[in-house]
Amino acid sequence: MTEQRLISELEQLVSEGRNPNTMHIDLLPTFDILREINYEDQTVPTAVEKVIPAIAAAVNQIVAAFQKGGRLIYMGAGTSGRLGVLDASECPPTFSVPSDMVIGLIAGGPEALQNSIEGAEDDPEQGRQALQDIKLTSTDVVVGIAVSGRTPYVIGGLNYAKSIGAVTIALSCNPNSIIAGIADLAISPVVGPEILTGSTRLKSGTAQKLILNMLTTASMIRIGKSYQNLMVDVHASNKKLVARAIRIVMQATGCTQADARRVLDQTGNDVKLAILMEITGMGIEEARAALQNAGGFLRKAISAKTA
């Protein structure tokens, strides 16, 4: 692509426009700069709210994939890629899922998490290769993340994913983007120009983070990873999380701290199992079988025993 064509394409993007509200931000004192940033940030949740129907459709596809043993794969470059990796990395400790159930891929590989890798996003072949390296299958869901909606790395990945029958989802912050035209589903929150022209780590990045939170959280709830609003599948891997596990058992059952600690010791800190045992009086093997029969849904297992 020629330089002139690239400039022309960027000029058409909402996310690359100049924000008329911040033309004189370089003249402002610190407090007023921060107030301008905060004012602009307040537009982000509204933009996300407008695309909830698209987010819901995406969640339904992700849930269907999980139920068939499929995976959720995020892919992006720069800030978009980092946000995908961040969200993916939070799923194992929060929901006790395997580390390869939600995967984050970033153009340039792991080094790009901390350092800019020159030209990494410009090659669609790298996007295809990244998905081949993780042995993408038709049961997986690929979410291509690109504020501009035109990142070659993401385009290459989405085209490959679609060619093998995987569900494809585009997340961009520009209407009618290239990746939206490729993917099966498009999520396109339009947050408008940034306070610093083209610095899409700001409002656009915030919108992406909110939506990625929604995709994984709602999907995990739908497959039984919560009871009420409690993280009953939390992986208690450090002192803080062990303390949280104790609190969750206490909150779910009304038991004492000592009783919560006792039943967690019996289950090896399996919170969901501990709650079921404490509420129903089941032994550990009976509770484990009941959870399996309920498909991992704690509420169903409790209802089946107490009905």
UniProtKB/Swiss-Prot annotation:
Entry EC number(s): 4.2.1.126
Record carries keyword Mitochondrion: no
Active site per the UniProt annotation: 90 (proton donor), 121
InterPro entries: Etherase_MurQ (IPR005488), Glucokinase_regulatory_CS (IPR005486), MURQ/GCKR (IPR040190), SIS_dom (IPR001347), SIS_dom_sf (IPR046348)
GO biological process terms, semicolon-separated: 1,6-anhydro-N-acetyl-beta-muramic acid catabolic process; amino sugar catabolic process; N-acetylmuramic acid catabolic process; peptidoglycan turnover
Top-rank taxon: Bacteria
Entry keywords, A to Z: Carbohydrate metabolism, Lyase
One annotated GO molecular function: carbohydrate derivative binding
Keyword Transport appears in the UniProt entry: no
Ranges for domain SIS: 62-225
Catalytic activity: N-acetyl-D-muramate 6-phosphate + H2O = N-acetyl-D-glucosamine 6-phosphate + (R)-lactate
Pathway assigned to this chain's UniProt record: Amino-sugar metabolism; 1,6-anhydro-N-acetylmuramate degradation; Amino-sugar metabolism; N-acetylmuramate degradation; Cell wall biogenesis; peptidoglycan recycling
Family statement drawn from the similarity comment of this UniProt entry: Belongs to the GCKR-like family. MurNAc-6-P etherase subfamily.
Its job: Specifically catalyzes the cleavage of the D-lactyl ether substituent of MurNAc 6-phosphate, producing GlcNAc 6-phosphate and D-lactate. Together with AnmK, is also required for the utilization of anhydro-N-acetylmuramic acid (anhMurNAc) either imported from the medium or derived from its own cell wall murein, and thus plays a role in cell wall recycling.
NCBIfam families to which the protein is assigned, alphabetical: N-acetylmuramic acid 6-phosphate etherase (TIGR00274), PRK05441.1 (NF003915), PRK12570.1 (NF009222)
Subunit field text: Homodimer.
Misc. comment: A lyase-type mechanism (elimination/hydration) is suggested for the cleavage of the lactyl ether bond of MurNAc 6-phosphate, with the formation of an alpha,beta-unsaturated aldehyde intermediate with (E)-stereochemistry, followed by the syn addition of water to give product.
Protein name per the record: N-acetylmuramic acid 6-phosphate etherase
Organism from which the protein derives: Rhizobium rhizogenes (strain K84 / ATCC BAA-868)
